Amino acid sequence: MPSASWEDLAADKRARLEKSIPDEWKFKSVPIEGSVIDLPEKSGILSPSEIKITNSSATELVAQLANGTLKSVDVTLAFCKRAALAHQLVNCAHDFFPELALAQARELDRYFETHKKPVGPLHGLPISLKDQLRVKGTETCMAYISWLGKRDTSDSILTALLRKAGAVFLVKTSVPQTLMVCETVNNIIGRTSNPRNLNLSCGGSSGGEGAMIAMRGGAIGIGTDIGGSIRVPAAFNSLYGIRPSHGRLPYGGMTNSMEGQETIHSVVGPIAHSAQDVRLFLQSVLKEEPWKYDSKVIPLPWREAEENAAQAKIAEKSLNFAFYDFDGVVRPHPPITRGVEIVRSTLEKDGHTVAPWTPYKHAFAVDLANKIYAADGSTDVYKHINASGEPAIPNIKDLMNPNLPKADLNEVWDAQLQKWRYQCEYLDKWREWEERTGKELDAIIAPVAATAAVRHNQFRYYGYATVFNVLDYTSVVVPVTYADKAVDHRLADYQPVSDMDKAVYAEYDPEVYHGAPVAVQIIGRRLSEERTLAIAEYVGKLLGH
């Protein structure tokens, strides 16, 4: 019997996904352009109480679940319905399993009724997962058609720890083929769009998470980041997200492209509507002591002392920031430079020190990262692509090219040395800033990307995010504003510094980008999650979040 074509396998997956949504949760029709972010609330499918539940913060929900005000089954049902609506509007799910979620919720309610207490800090909280995390009994395809039809027989370590903490899993979200793209498109479900404008990208590779959380189809989402894949979707969807340093959270048991590539690590982290919810996630996971289950995790519990140190400087209005709005390689679009200026001026008016930062060898770092990502000649990703006969998506052709030569072992070792030397040199620059200003540098303010949420197929330059993957610095995304055609005009005297710079700037159209989310990243040193998140939360509060 002949094997099924890749088209048939993809069609079968889409049919199964469609069948997983009950008819009573379906729209009669959906728009193909414009904003859809408010449509779930206007659908008539969600009750007033379900709208209230899904609009609540994760922090609010766990408090009400812990004191018995809310039942897990009611919260889970509300988020299942909203996740189903989100997928119909922006195409953001790979696997949807409301029956498993509701069964898990009922078990949690029975536990609470018997023991009069929650099972853990995330008791009954619905969490959305990027399609890299394994959940026993569900399908993980990671956008490869050749992976379809296989059920997970166990949880990833992070999934297991979240389950132990009381989290409920309801959906796995879309990713781009290979993961190595800051947009989300694949041959299985097609393209995932931005809820605020269907003509714009949701980002990637955790783009399905960004879109799902923006639509409030999960209380918190989990993404991964090897070159901006948490931060870009958070920025493009006006959300908070953290790229923790390698070794802080468990990655064990998750799927990935280029497994065994250990020079630049992919890390896992949350995407949420507030810094408070990001903190809830981090504290809850670290409370489970993940270093006992994943040998790559550093035995480092949540450090309140670090958080308190940042809070003390906040109270004294003595924070010290560096900032830049141009990395010397690609000039950001006007909405992005305005976003950096809003943050700079807001902090300065509040009494803090904000001084310029000179980006150090960012072009070198980006080039090094690209060489590392393609060191195997793209053998790994094309093995999975070719196994089904599906074509490679056009978006990966520059980075993941099967015609690129493989690096030999000496070249890999040399790349690792170059990375380490660059990390040391960047630390030198950090100390030089402190010596020059006479102040401790608390964080750097920088763009996340050169553009606001970008038009489909137009994300070209990864450098603003990728450099901090090379450095392994902690980075938190803070939403700032939205592109405004009335003020974000093209620069009349703009002169490109490179072909890439010219191509990126040529993409800017004030009319097209009007209303697109704008964010910055707050960057701290390696393993500075507590301090950096506290500072990012404060920045958000100053901005009115």
Curated annotation (Swiss-Prot):
The family this protein is said to belong to: Belongs to the amidase family.
Catalysed reactions listed for this entry: a monocarboxylic acid amide + H2O = a monocarboxylate + NH4(+); acetamide + H2O = acetate + NH4(+)
Described purpose of this protein according to its UniProt entry: Allows acetamide to be used as a sole carbon or nitrogen source.
Keyword Hydrolase applies: yes
GO molecular-function terms, A-Z: amidase activity
Any Pfam family the entry gives: Amidase
E.C. number(s) listed in UniProt: 3.5.1.4
Domain of life where this protein originates: Eukaryota
Record flagged with keyword Hydrolase: yes
SUPFAM superfamilies: Amidase signature (AS) enzymes
Record-linked Gene3D superfamilies: Amidase signature (AS) domain (3.90.1300.10)
Record-annotated active site: K130 (charge relay system), S205 (charge relay system), S229 (acyl-ester intermediate)
InterPro entries listed in its UniProt record: Amidase_CS, Amidase_dom, AS_sf
Name this polypeptide is given: Acetamidase
Alphabetical UniProt keywords: Hydrolase
Gene assigned in the entry: amdS
Native organism: Aspergillus oryzae (strain ATCC 42149 / RIB 40) (Yellow koji mold)
